[in-house]
A protein has these predicted regions:
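A "functional boundary" signal
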Residues: 2, 7-10, 15-298
Length: 298
């Protein structure tokens, strides 16, 4: 009986080793195909942008134009940063013409988002520091806190020293609680930020449980799974599980590519892992794709 148990344990371990790589191989092939099909995904997004621009040309009021520019900004963010900046500036001008301070601040936060997205952290912080949370509505305050969180997270990622990295990570952590307090408990935004907080606190199992729940919800509702997937990839990276890190980086990268997102991190992180494993050709393809999309995004 003992020998049978040992045999079954060895067999199951062997099977798991074969099942997991084949799953990753399948995901990588899907990612390869998605990269080849990038032009059609880009065309679809551009058609959505063109439709909004047609509505803008036919709009009859500043309020209608302001709302349409908000939608247009959403289409341009993570796609064409120079265009996103132009749209944000248009929103500022419209808001001033409408003499609506709340709208002005909202549009200025869009500009801060773009500055942060193109690594102009000083300029982004100057805009944020010039805005008071008391001058914003509830959704604006949440957005405001998130931009502070984002800039400090990115500054931590690219900090020169470990001391500076920890300093900026600490600043970003302070905003996690602020963001969580502004979001509806149980909502996807609430849960995703809670998972980030748990990762910072090294509570990896709890974070993974939340992220898997978010992943399932996003999948069921037809949302992009890019964000919960990159969260899971980060969690497994902290735990030293390279195989699951690769799996979720691949899933996140597929979602990004198919959504015609041009500003992303999953693909080049995956490329780095594959390069370390000796898959030089695929790593080169992924880095080349990332560079092309970064150039397109400006």
């Amino acid at each position: 009986m003992t020998k049978l148990k040992v045999f079954l344990a060895v067999l199951l371990a062997s099977l798991s080793l074969h099942i997991h790589p084949s799953e990753i191989d399948s995901l990588l092939r899907e990612l390869d195909m998605s990269i080849r099909n990038r032009p059609q995904y880009t065309l679809k997004r551009q058609e959505q942008i063109d439709a909004l621009q047609r509505k803008l040309r036919l709009s009859h009021s500043d309020q209608e134009r302001y709302d349409l520019y908000r939608e247009l900004f959403g289409k341009y963010r993570s796609y064409r940063m120079d265009s996103a900046l132009w749209v944000a500036n248009q929103r500022v001008e419209l808001a001033k013409r409408m003499k609506n301070p709340l709208y002005v601040r909202s549009a200025e936060l869009n500009i801060a988002e773009v500055m942060i997205g193109v690594a102009m952290y000083k300029e982004g912080l100057e805009i944020l520091d010039g805005i008071k949370s008391a001058d914003l509505d509830a959704s604006g305050v949440s957005y405001y806190y998130y931009q502070y969180h984002q800039v400090y997270t990115l500054m931590a990622d690219y900090a020169f020293s470990d001391q500076m990295k920890e300093h900026y990570r600490g600043l970003a952590y302070q905003y996690k609680d602020s963001i969580i307090s502004m979001r509806r408990p149980g909502s996807q935004g609430y849960l995703l930020m809670m998972s980030e907080k748990l990762l910072y606190e090294e509570k990896y199992d709890e974070a993974i449980e939340i992220l898997k729940s978010c992943y399932k919800t996003h999948e069921e509702k037809g949302y992009s799974v890019a964000i919960p997937s990159i969260g899971l990839a980060n969690a497994y990276a902290f735990m030293g599980n390279t195989e699951l890190q690769k799996k979720y980086l691949a899933i996140s990268a597929i979602a990004d590519i198919q959504a015609a997102t041009k500003e992303y991190i999953s693909l080049w992180k995956l490329a780095n892992l594959l390069f370390q494993e000796g898959d030089i050709k695929r790593a080169y393809t992924y880095i080349e794709c990332s560079m092309q999309d970064a150039t397109f995004c400006n």
